[in-house]
Amino acid sequence: MFAPEVISREDRDGGYIETLLPAERGEVYYRSCVGGICRYSSDWFQAEIYLNQMLQP
């Protein structure tokens, strides 16, 4: 199994959202991460929601 290619990254307030391109054919998806915990989504706006939720104290 091959790792996805990170095609962009946006850092914000101690977390980030990466835009990922699958190694094999498929659609772009997003990874929201804070402190080593990540959530995945197929929608940029959902990735923003995940990041905001994980950044809240």
Map each language-model feature to its residues.
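A short, charged, amphipathic alpha-helix used as a generic interaction element across diverse proteins
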Residues: 29-57
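Short N-terminal "domain-start" leader segments
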Residues: 1-29
